[in-house]
């Protein structure tokens, strides 16, 4: 005997597990809000005082963060139809972004004009986000991890290297963003630099998850996420190419971003090939 077709279809859908509907809704909300915000930052990087939660200067920084938001649209959008075992790393990674972001926000409240709704929206977002994603992680803490093939050792090392690079960047930006910005082709204000450090800690977590978990299916979303964020950073740099600093520093900046993009894409590809052999 064969199972009814409706049961077969249910078994084939990755979102039929209990609790998946709220997760999909949350991922979709992040993708939509991030994509819209990123579009504004890329199109009008010099006018953030009119529509953003705080004045995000200089324009190259606004475009860089805008590119990160657009990357979030693709990363969280792609996660919508993935099973929990494959998006767990991304969901956990949001805490590495939102908890530090909430901390630096309260450390720099002076940059916000709380007479504007956008300022309140920023604070509420970074209060609600870790609570929402943290609750999902807690409720699904007993869910099994993916049972699949390993990430090839060389790419596990590369993932660890990516995590180390982004960790160093995050620590430097949190500790002294103005001094750390000396290696960049644009200046960083204190709050803007620390916000960028929060994005770096998010990417460090994704790389670390891939290196530690090292399961072919489980690491694909985190590794592809790093690649998307590097592509977004390159897009942001090209958007304000003329505003970037000295030629040598500008070239080195793009070279580093391109190298990180290639390494993350190569690792994602290796994970995908390894998973397809099962």
Language model features with spans:
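Short, intrinsically disordered terminal tails adjacent to the first/last structured region
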Residues: 1-13, 276-278
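An N-terminus-focused feature that recognizes amino-terminal "leader" regions
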Residues: 11-90, 182-188, 248-249, 267-270, ...
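Surface-exposed interaction/gating patches
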Residues: 20-39, 142-213
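Membrane-interfacial loop-to-transmembrane alpha-helix junctions, especially the N-terminal start
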Residues: 23-28, 84-94, 156, 217-225
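Juxtamembrane "helix-exit" motif on the non-cytosolic side of transmembrane helices
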Residues: 43-50, 106-114, 173-181, 236-244
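Core segments of alpha-helical transmembrane spans in multipass integral membrane proteins
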Residues: 60-78, 96, 191-211, 228
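Hydrophobic, ordered structural segments
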Residues: 71-144, 150, 236, 246-274
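Hydrophobic alpha-helical membrane segments
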Residues: 92-105, 199-203, 222-238
């Amino acid at each position: 005997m064969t199972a009814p077709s409706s049961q077969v279809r249910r078994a084939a859908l990755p979102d039929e597990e209990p609790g998946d509907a709220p997760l999909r809704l949350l991922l979709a909300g992040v993708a939509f809000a991030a994509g819209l915000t990123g579009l504004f930052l890329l199109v009008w990087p010099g006018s953030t005082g009119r529509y953003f939660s705080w004045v995000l200067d200089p324009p190259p920084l606004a475009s860089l963060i805008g590119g990160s938001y657009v990357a979030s649209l693709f990363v969280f959008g792609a996660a919508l139809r993935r099973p929990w075992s494959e998006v767990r790393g991304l969901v956990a990674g949001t805490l590495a972004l939102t908890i530090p972001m909430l901390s630096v926000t309260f450390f720099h409240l002076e940059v916000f004009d709380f007479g504007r709704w956008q300022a309140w929206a920023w604070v509420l977002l970074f209060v609600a986000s870790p609570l929402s994603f943290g609750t999902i992680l807690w409720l699904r803490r007993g869910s099994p991890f993916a049972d699949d093939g390993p990430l090839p050792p060389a790419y596990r090392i590369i993932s660890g290297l990516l995590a180390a690079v982004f960790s160093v960047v995050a620590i430097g930006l949190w500790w002294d963003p103005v001094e750390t910005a000396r290696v960049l082709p644009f200046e960083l204000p204190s709050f803007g630099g620390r916000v960028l450090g929060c994005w770096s800690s998010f990417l460090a977590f994704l790389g670390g998850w891939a290196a530690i978990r090292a399961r072919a299916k489980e690491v694909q979303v985190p590794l592809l996420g790093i690649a998307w964020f590097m592509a977004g950073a390159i897009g942001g740099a090209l958007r304000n190419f003329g505003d970037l600093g000295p030629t040598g520093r500008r070239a080195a900046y793009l070279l580093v971003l391109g190298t990180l993009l290639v390494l993350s894409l190569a690792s994602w590809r290796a994970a995908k090939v390894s998973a397809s052999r099962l």
